[in-house]
Structures are given as C-alpha cells and as structure tokens.
C-alpha cells in the first residue's frame, strides 16, 4: 500500500478448504503488463518443531526461507527499487502471493481463477521461486497430473488361476499394465509417471484424497480388486495427451477374466519451453553479465516440479520462473537460504522489469 499498490485478499468458502491469496495491483499504463508470482504457505505445520530463524554467516535457516519467503521478499524489494527511481507509478504490474501453492487441493478451477485472469491480462509472467543459483533460469516447468488405475478379477480358488473359467485375477492384470507402462513409455524425454500407492486383494478400501487404503486377501484366493494411484509429469500438453492415450490403450488390452479402467486428473498444466521464454532469458542473462553475476543458462525442466507459473504461462507472451534467491534443502529441516543472492536477484529483476516497461 505504501508503494501505491491496490491490495486485496481473495478468500474462498470453507467447503473449498484452501487458503486465500494476496494480490497487489499497480496500473500506471506504461509498457509491458507484468504479473509476478510468489506464495505465502510452506510445507511445515504450525506444530512442526522446525520454527526458528537462525543465521550463520551468509546462510539463513528457517521453515520456508528458500521455498519461498525469500522470493516474496525479492518481489517486494524489486518494487521498492523501482519506486525509488520514480518508475513504479507508471507501470502495469500485478503481484500474486498465493496461499496454497504447496497443496493445491481438488478445486484448482476455483482457487486459481484469479491467477489465471491475471495471466490473461498480462504480457509477461515471472515466478519467484529459486532456480538453484545465479547462473540458471527456468524457461519450462512440467505439468503435474494424477491417475487412478482400477482392475478387477474373478474371485475363486487359486488352484484354478490362469484357467479359462477364472482367468488371471486383478493383481496380475495391474502388474501387466504397470510393466507395460514402463516398457513403452519410460524412455521418453521429460515424461515421468509413478505409481505411488497400490491396494489389492479380495476386499479393498482406498481413500484417494489421503492416499491411504486397506486390503484383505488370501494366498489361496484369486484377487478380485486392485487400485493403483499414481502421478504423471510432462513438458507439454501434447506430450500429456499422447501419454494418456498410450496408457489407455495398454489398460484396454486385458488379460482373460479381468477388466481395467484408468482416470486422469490434471492439477498443474505445463509451462512449455517457448522461443519467447528463451528470448526473455537472454535479456535476463545480459543483465546478469552486466552486474557481474556471469552467464545464465536454462535449467533442465526435468529438474523442476510443477508451480503456479504454469497457470499463467499459456496466456502470456513469455514467462520465466526461478527468478528468486538461491536456497537449498526445501521441504526439510535443513532448509537454508544463501543471503548473498537476495540483493542480486532483486536488482536484476528490477532492471529487467524496468527495461520491459519502457
């Protein structure tokens, strides 16, 4: 507010079970329209023992200090720098501080509506999580989707397993499918898929929201039911569509006496590696070199998970993530920030935004 931004909270009904978001808007009308993305939440619960800030030289330890309190600070101080030289008031900028980045939940169309609208308004998108140092930038991030595979078999005495009347059972069918996924798709670049939980037997229960289940079975009874819950990541929507079609085809080729089905749910779309993103990284590299920080190379997308920049990237002309300071040990009690990188990422972001808005 002190810088002249219009700030407001976006909140949701209790039934959504997700935190709200803080937005700040500057509408000066000059140059490219910019949206900058941070997040306020961490993975650490209120009662988690890791709750202290400790500084050791240029290392600062604390919950969420790298992921991503420091990125939020870098965003704010880049705005302060632009205000200091009298440039901020003329710019079109939206700052989005998301409240539930670490666990999106089941209502992405609801809780990312405002962020997507900001992306449609903007020309350029920036994500302020770190990229692992001052010499790498993020021009792409993979998607995050989930899948649930269900197989069924004919329950009966195991002495007749593989017979024409009884067939192979649900567990053999799920094993066939998972192995076929591996054989046909595992070598494709930027495509990863992982079965994270499996429950199978005569009688099963599975809770997909909490990834927990129970199973009952006997060694002399052919299994009747299996549920497999997994994830899939891709570099583009085309790759995701192709992978889903391949997986569906594998699932449909059932062993005798079995049935199978698979369902997919996309949580985060991919941030695809467009030429415009590479060009924007080149502009940032020019600044990096001019400030004495060295070369800036694109980070391998397979090294990154999903992030909120992916909701903005399809709608803007160009996007970069990894704009924030360098830290390590995210999501652990060893999480720390390299304090020396905080002023560096702040200054180069301010200069890039200044140039984009001339």
Residue locations for each model-derived region?
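Metal-dependent amide/peptide-bond hydrolase catalytic core
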Residues: 15, 130-133, 139, 146-358
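Acidic/histidine-rich catalytic neighborhood of metal-dependent amide-processing enzymes
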Residues: 68-144, 200-210, 357
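Short glycine-enriched loops at secondary-structure junctions
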Residues: 39-43, 49, 142-145, 198-201
């Amino acid at each position: 507010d002190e810088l002249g931004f219009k700030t407001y909270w976006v909140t949701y009904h209790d039934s959504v079970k997700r935190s709200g978001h803080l937005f700040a808007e500057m509408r000066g009308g000059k140059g490219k329209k910019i949206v900058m993305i941070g997040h306020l939440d961490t993975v650490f619960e209120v009662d988690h023992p890791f709750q202290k800030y400790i500084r050791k030289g240029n290392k600062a330890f604390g919950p969420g200090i790298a992921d991503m309190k420091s990125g939020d600070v870098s965003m704010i101080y880049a705005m302060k720098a632009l205000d200091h030289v009298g440039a901020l008031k003329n710019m079109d900028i939206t700052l989005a501080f998301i409240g539930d980045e670490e666990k999106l939940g089941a209502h992405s169309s609801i809780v990312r509506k405002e962020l997507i609208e900001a992306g449609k308004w903007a020309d350029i998108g920036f994500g302020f999580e770190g990229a692992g140092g001052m010499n790498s930038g993020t021009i792409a991030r993979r998607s995050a989707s989930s899948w649930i595979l269900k197989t069924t078999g004919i329950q009966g005495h195991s002495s007749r397993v593989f017979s024409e009347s009884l067939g192979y059972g649900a567990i053999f069918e799920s094993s066939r499918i998972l192995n076929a996924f591996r054989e046909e798709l595992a070598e494709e670049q930027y495509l990863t898929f992982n079965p994270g939980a499996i429950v199978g037997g005569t009688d099963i229960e599975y809770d997909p929201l909490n990834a927990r289940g129970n199973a009952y079975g006997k060694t002399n009874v052919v299994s009747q039911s299996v549920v497999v819950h997994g994830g899939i990541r891709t570099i583009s929507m085309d790759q995701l569509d192709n992978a889903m079609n391949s997986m569906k085809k594998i699932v449909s080729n059932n062993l005798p006496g079995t049935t199978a089905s698979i369902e997919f749910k996309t949580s985060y779309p991919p941030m695809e590696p467009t030429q415009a993103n590479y060009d924007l990284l080149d502009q940032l590299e020019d600044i990096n070199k001019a400030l004495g920080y060295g070369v800036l190379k694109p980070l391998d997308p397979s090294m990154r998970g999903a992030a909120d920049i992916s909701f903005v990237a399809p709608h803007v002309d160009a996007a970069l993530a990894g704009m924030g300071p360098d830290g390590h040990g995210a999501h652990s009690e060893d999480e720390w920030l390299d304090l020396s990188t905080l002023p560096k990422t702040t200054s180069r972001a301010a200069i890039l935004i200044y140039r984009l808005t001339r």
